[in-house]
Swiss-Prot record:
GO terms for molecular function: DNA binding; DNA-directed RNA polymerase activity; ribonucleoside binding. It comes from Cellvibrio japonicus (strain Ueda107). Belongs to the RNA polymerase beta chain family. DNA-dependent RNA polymerase catalyzes the transcription of DNA into RNA using the four ribonucleoside triphosphates as substrates. Keywords: DNA-directed RNA polymerase, Nucleotidyltransferase, Transcription, Transferase. Its EC number is 2.7.7.6. NCBIfam families: PRK00405.1, rpoB. It catalyses: RNA(n) + a ribonucleoside 5'-triphosphate = RNA(n+1) + diphosphate. This is DNA-directed RNA polymerase subunit beta. One of its GO terms (cellular component) is DNA-directed RNA polymerase complex. One of its GO terms (biological process) is DNA-templated transcription. The RNAP catalytic core consists of 2 alpha, 1 beta, 1 beta' and 1 omega subunit. When a sigma factor is associated with the core the holoenzyme is formed, which can initiate transcription.
């Protein structure tokens, strides 16, 4: 197999047994693909598909004026260039966006001509605001902060049938309902009430009988009945008896009210007997099609058609009239020969529409329309036109109603139609078909839908949501344009004068800036970034709300398999509403989640991969990824465990149609990073995957000894590392940049063939952690495309590294690890294992105030020399200064209001020019409790103001950096060009040239003796060579010109002033780097949900040690394992111990300078001979140099990968422990560090990967002496941010009361809280060294008195003197 640059340096021993079928797809694809579809920036205007921006414009344009004499048509759009790149936008606090220009065509028609002749056409490009661009990592920079737009899981448009589970009516009767949900437009609900009448609701308003809707669609009563019912025919004979046309199947289950006979008079069913299937067969056999029935047989039935008197032609009875004996006698008297009745029965053909018609008050279409108008717009007087227009706009107008392609597909599928495409609006057939389906479900035929099925929920990603917002903006523009279009013809306006882009820009800005789904990116570490971008929210606009979401929505559903992770979801009120995409899941064109499967043909597994959505999946039989196969890929077991119709069953291999592609297909990225996940309880795995996202990047990242093999994918896809765009040779590398000379094969014509990667150094992340990239390549290394060149935060050698491998013992230790506390050795602090760097950004803003402008200066009133010692002459702190709480970072003074001066003061001021008292000190100071180093300062000055010394220095430094970059690029291009020329010229004959004899053959020495520009003056005998020389000269000149232009562009950006908010003159941003060591109170965790707080840091000499004198780093409580059932941590420790032991052995081989062959054979034994190795590592292809490099990287331990659900088995761990010459029990004898005594029994010791979580005691600890008070209650504020106090609540008061501690209680409720006079007096007393207190009246009593007065009760406190 081919190893990448970093894999060669450090191979992970993989325990996976299952074959590798499919690489993990690019993890950010869901974000990037969605937004790429939205902008279609890389496609030319005529090739754009009807999605995204293009679709939004197409749906709103053309806009036609009210008179119809002018129209505005959309032609195409183009995206401009971004003013600043991503990093500049973050620095300046602006949005990373590009201008959108739309080409529109204004057509004016001739009023006079009959056939709308075109009078005038004007075409113009119109600016339509800015569209935010997505960065390469799937984020947006909005106002300088990185944000993520998370995808939303919402109910798919279409039609859904459901019932109320018997909760509405006390009888527990199931009331069925149908709901048509469009993508945009009014909802249409049909529902049964307890009396089995069918009602309709529009937009959840009050209900109307469903037949009103049908009548509004222009159906008559008779048409309605014929659509929903079959009829029974009765013919009146000469003898006054009725003859019934028999449909035998309809009689089943009825009780015969008379003898039923065949043609010969034989009785088939006796009176009073129930008619069974056997009777029906006999009737069919006897060919009975007519049957004499008594007239009572017709009573209670309903007429299917209007009954008309044949003689007079008058209407006797309307259809749907119930037949009574009175009605029947009139029908007979009128001489009606044939009566048709509705066929209904109790079981499977209820009379619902017929009953509903009886309560329907309307008779004509207009009445029905008026009724609907009254329901939608109560209180408005209806007219015929307004009623018709309202109804037409509800479901039948393309502007107001759209099912969308998805909705139409789901709608047609649910109603069992052949086609999946159709109109976006509803048709009469659609509405009738939905009612028919609902009635058939009520009749017991068919099933209701499961709304939690992932076939009924679809994912809306960034692109789609941005398109919707954009359309909302365009619709607002449309209204304004329509008004102005009528003026366009008379005043000769251009398209630019018609369109005001503000509403579009506002809608887009609002969505990206403040939508519930546009979130501040979680940038703790690379994993949290990736997880945030792969989030699926059920909340948000158009989704659920926390309060309404029940248990079912939150629960794991069988269709989540391979689509949504069943493990990773937050604990707390959002559980189950925020999910994470499974590793291999993707969305299809309709927005439904799909999962990949391998095709199985007649028991043989192929390598063909197909994606199935939840809609299709249930019909297939799908085997697990772990099903055993023989060498030919055939399923070997007699019965295979499969999933079929959302259930797990066993089937024969020949029945299997698909098979999972991987064992980690089920879980998300975070869960797939937990080794031995299969041995952990689900609740703990949930905590484990959530806590990995909170790990803070440590000073020196360390790869996990026990991983899962996913670490490399996460690091590469997260975007925090520098990944080679093209293969090549490392030309130069330092801490800040890597220069790659690209392989000739990958260089395109006219391209420099140089890739320069500038590394990010010590930048602040959204969570104030530190982002820093370190190169891992050396000069001269050969890299290929996709290799990792530099590690980012929490990445080690191209692998995700969130924590540190710690030597851990499971034992109680003096109660210091009671209840999940953690005992840590001082060595961990000394070695800076969990030291993290946090970067804080502090901002000082100088504004223009009413009293004059604020000034940033080092001249601050009443501040001593020492306080100003760290500021330069501009009043800004030096880079590198060590500052602590209260130190001045930026000196700033603000004008004070003019006070009335005494004559003496005026005189003094006139003499000495004393102005210091006019300003007050409002400098930026370091917040209390913070200590750090200034690592960067940025100064932004308003355009038009003169820049101070400091900003000019910063600007110069930045320009030098750019110049250095460009020179480097030119140097490499130049070198490469001359190398190619040298290769072509050596040995060729010169025709003429300075410093060279004619007819001489060129050698390396001659060329070295020439100045570089003299090479271009050479003329050779061959014309082809002369052409090559000229072309090289042109290319270099062209390159130099391009680089100079880039430099000028950068210079222009830096030297122009900044676009600051109104009233702001200058902004200074100071970045502090704060080093946080680990300390008691910090939260730590493993990857299995085993979290705890550090209780104490013990000296190394007191920690338990083994017989070699090796102390443990951390002591954990063994009681934390059994009840929590996360045994994965114990297995991880054992395997970690083996990994470390093997590293020690390799180190010994290197120290003893053993032959390379010995090292190679030991590595062969580790990788290819120990355990059940599925895929062997190809160490034979490694050179001796590479083997030594590999061995040196394995000294700290041989990294292992135990993939989820396919991990290391117990016997393999034991084999590795034996290979490392360790006890295969995984237990060790330990000695007490304080006494030297051996502990009474052996202890489990091993290596576990521990994380330091972003819940640091420094951020939480807080103390208050005096501070600010709440205005009304006069009690101290709460919380660290407000510098608040601790609340002494009701229950605490009870505790003091229980102890009878009256004086303490008095102190708590008065001087320490809201007794204003008492606390001031107390403070004075303490200053004077007198510790007495005089409690007075608490302010809360006064508040109570005032509140009672507000009720109109006067209450006065009478105090005794």
């Amino acid at each position: 197999m081919a190893y990448s640059y970093t894999e060669k340096k450090r191979i992970r021993k993989n325990f996976g047994k299952l074959p590798h079928v499919m690489d993990v797809p690019y993890l950010l694809a869901i974000q990037l693909d969605s937004y790429r579809k939205f902008t279609q920036a890389d496609l030319s205007a005529n090739k754009r598909e009807d999605v995204g921006l293009h679709a939004a414009f197409r749906s709103v344009f053309p806009i036609v004026s009210y008179s119809g004499n002018a129209a505005l048509e959309y032609v195409s759009y183009s995206l401009g260039k971004a003013a600043f790149d991503v990093n500049e936008c973050i620095l300046r606090g602006v949005t990373y966006a590009v201008p959108l220009r739309v080409k529109v065509r204004l057509i004016i028609y001739d009023r006079e001509s009959a056939n709308k002749a075109i009078k005038d056409i004007k075409e113009q490009e119109v600016y339509m605001g800015e569209i935010p661009l997505m960065t390469d990592n799937g984020t947006f920079v909005i106002n300088g902060t990185e944000r993520v737009i998370v995808s939303q899981l919402h109910r798919s448009p279409g039609v859904f049938f459901d019932h109320d589970k018997g909760k509405t009516h006390s009888s527990g009767k199931l009331l069925y309902s149908a709901r048509i949900i469009p993508y945009r437009g009014s909802w249409l609900d049909f529902e049964f009430d307890p009396k089995d009448l069918l009602y309709v609701r529009i937009d959840r308003r009050r209900k109307l009988p469903a037949t009103i809707l049908l009548r509004a669609l222009n159906y008559s009563s008779q048409e309605m009945l014929s659509m929903f019912f079959e009829t029974s025919s009765f013919t009146l004979g000469k003898d006054g008896q009725f003859s019934y046309e028999v449909v035998p199947s309809r009689l089943r289950g009825d009780v015969a009210t008379f003898d039923i006979k065949d043609d010969k008079g034989n009785i088939i069913v006796e009176e009073g007997r129930r008619i069974t299937a056997r009777h029906i067969r006999q009737l069919e056999k006897a060919g009975v099609d007519q049957m004499e029935v008594p007239s009572e047989y017709l009573l209670g039935r309903s007429l299917a058609k209007d009954i008309v008197d044949t003689r007079t032609g008058e209407l006797l009875f309307e259809c749907n009239t119930e037949i009574t004996s009175d009605v029947l006698s009139k029908i007979v008297a009128a001489g009606v020969e044939k009566v048709e009745t509705l066929y209904t029965n109790e079981l499977d053909c209820g009379p619902f529409i017929s009953e509903t018609l009886r309560i329907d008050p309307t008779r004509t279409q207009l009445e029905a329309l008026v009724e609907i108008y009254r329901m939608m717009r109560p209180g408005e007087p209806p007219t015929k036109e307004s009623a018709e227009a309202l109804f037409q706009n509800l479901f039948f107008s393309q502007e107001r109603y759209d099912l969308s392609a998805v909705g139409r597909m789901k709608f047609n599928r649910r109603l069992g139609r052949e086609t999946e495409t159709g109109e976006g609006t509803l048709s009469n057939d659609d509405i009738v078909d939905v009612m028919k389906t609902l009635i058939s479900i009520r009749n017991g035929k068919g099933v209701v839908d499961d709304i939690d099925h992932l076939g009924n929920r679809r994912v809306r990603s960034v692109g789609e949501m941005a398109e919707n917002q954009f359309r909302v903006g365009l619709v607002r523009v449309e209204r304004a344009v329509k008004e102005r279009l009528s003026m366009a013809e008379s005043e000769g306006l251009m398209p630019q004068d018609l369109i005001n882009a503000k509403p579009v820009a506002a809608a887009v800005k609002e969505f990206f800036g403040s939508s519930q789904l546009s979130q501040f990116m979680d940038q703790n570490n690379p994993l949290s970034e990736i997880t945030h971008k792969r989030r699926v929210f059920a909340l948000g606009p158009g989704g659920l709300t926390r309060e309404r979401a029940g248990f079912e929505v939150r629960d794991v559903h069988p269709t989540h398999y391979g689509r949504v992770c069943p493990i990773e979801t937050p604990e707390g009120p959002n559980i189950g509403l925020i999910n994470s995409l499974a590793t291999y899941a993707r969305t299809n064109n309709y927005g439904f989640l799909e999962s990949p499967y391998r095709k199985v043909i007649e028991g043989k597994v192929t390598d063909q991969i197909e994606y199935l959505s939840a809609i299709n999946e249930s019909e297939y039989v799908i085997a697990q990824a772990s099903a055993s196969l023989d060498d030919n890929g055939r399923l070997t077991e007699e019965l295979v465990s499969v999933r079929h119709q959302n259930e797990f069953t066993l089937k024969a291999p020949t029945d299997v149609q698909y098979m999972d592609v991987s064992a980690r297909q089920v879980v998300s990225v975070a869960a797939s990073l937990i080794p031995f996940l299969e041995h952990d309880d689900a609740n703990r795995a949930l905590m484990g995957s959530n806590m990995q996202r909170q790990a803070v990047p440590t000073l020196r990242s360390q790869k996990p000894l026990v991983g899962t093999g996913m670490e490399r994918n996460v690091a590469a896809d997260s975007g925090v590392c520098v990944v080679a765009k093209r293969g090549g040779v490392i030309d130069s590398v330092d801490a800040g940049r890597i220069v790659v000379k690209v392989h000739d094969a990958e260089v395109e014509a006219g391209d420099a063939g140089v890739d320069i990667y500038n590394l990010i150094k010590y930048t602040r992340s959204n969570q104030n952690t530190c982002i820093n990239q370190r190169p891992i390549v050396s000069m001269g290394d050969i890299v290929s495309r996709g290799d990792i060149l530099a590690d980012g935060p929490s990445v080690d050698m191209g692998e995700l590294a969130l924590g540190q491998n710690m030597r851990i013992a499971f034992m109680p230790w003096n109660g210091y690890n009671f209840e999940d506390s953690i005992l840590v050795s001082e060595r961990v602090v000394q070695e800076d294992r969990f030291t993290t760097i946090h970067i804080q950004e502090l901002t000082c803003i100088a504004r223009d105030t009413k009293l004059g402008s604020e000034e940033i200066t080092a001249d601050i009133p009443n501040v001593g020399e020492s306080a100003l010692s760290k500021l330069d002459e501009s009043g800004i702190v030096y880079i590198g200064a060590e500052v602590g709480g209260g130190d001045i970072l930026v000196g700033k003074v603000t004008p004070k209001g003019e006070t009335q001066l005494t004559p003496e003061e005026k005189l003094l001021r006139a003499i000495f020019g004393e102005k210091a008292s006019d300003v007050k000190d409002t400098s930026l100071r370091v917040p209390s409790g913070t200590k750090g180093t200034v690592i960067d300062v940025q100064v932004f000055t308003r355009d038009g103001l003169e820049k101070d010394q400091r900003s000019l220095e910063i600007e110069k430094a930045q320009l030098d950096e750019v110049r250095k970059d460009l020179n480097e690029e030119f140097r490499i291009v130049e070198t490469a060009t001359f190398e190619r020329l040298r290769a072509a010229l050596v040995g060729q004959i010169v025709a003429s040239g300075k410093g060279v004899k004619k007819g001489e053959a060129l050698t390396h020495d001659i060329l070295d003796g020439l100045e570089k520009d003299q090479w271009f003056k050479l003329r050779m005998n061959e014309d082809a060579l002369n052409e090559q020389i000229d072309r090289a000269e042109e290319q270099l000149a062209e390159r130099r010109k391009i680089l100079d232009e880039r430099f000028e562009d950068k210079k222009r950006k830096l030297s122009t002033g900044d676009d600051l908010a109104p009233g702001v003159l200058k902004i200074v941003k100071v970045y502090l780097a704060i080093k946080r060591r680990i300390q008691p109170g910090d939260k730590m965790a493993g990857r299995h949900g085993n979290k705890g707080v550090i209780s104490v840091i013990m000296p190394v000499e007191d920690m338990p040690y083994d017989e070699n004198g090796e102390t443990v780093d951390i002591v954990l409580n063994p009681l934390g394992v059994p009840s929590r059932m996360n045994v994965g941590q114990v297995l991880e420790m054992h395997l970690g111990m083996a990994a470390k032991g093997l590293g020690v052995k390799i180190n010994k081989l290197i120290q003893e300078q053993k032959a390379v062959a010995d090292i190679r054979s030991f590595l062969e034994e580790i990788y290819n001979s120990t355990g059940d190795v599925a895929a062997k590592e190809d160490l034979v292809s490694f050179s001796d140099r590479e083997v030594i490099d590999l061995a040196k990287n394995l000294v700290d331990g041989v990294p292992m990968a135990t993939p989820v659900f396919d991990g290391a088995k117990e016997h393999e761990i034991k084999a590795l422990l034996r290979l490392a010459s360790l006890s295969d029990t995984g237990q060790t004898t330990l000695f007490d560090g304080r006494t030297g005594d051996q502990f009474s029994r052996s202890v489990t010791v091993g290596y576990m990967y521990m994380l330091k979580l972003n819940h640091l005691v420094d951020d939480k600890m807080h103390a208050r002496s005096t501070g600010s008070y709440s205005l009304v209650t006069q009690q101290p504020l709460g919380g660290k941010a407000q510098f608040g106090g601790q609340r002494f609540g009701e229950m605490e008061v009870w505790a003091l009361e229980a102890y009878g501690a009256a004086y303490t209680l008095q102190e708590m409720l008065t001087v320490k809280s809201d007794d204003v006079a008492g606390r001031t007096k107390m403070y004075k007393n303490i200053v004077d060294g007198d510790h007495r207190m005089e409690p007075g009246m608490p302010e809360s009593f006064n508040v109570l008195v005032k509140e009672i007065r507000s009720l109109g009760i006067n209450i006065e406190l009478e105090q005794e003197d």
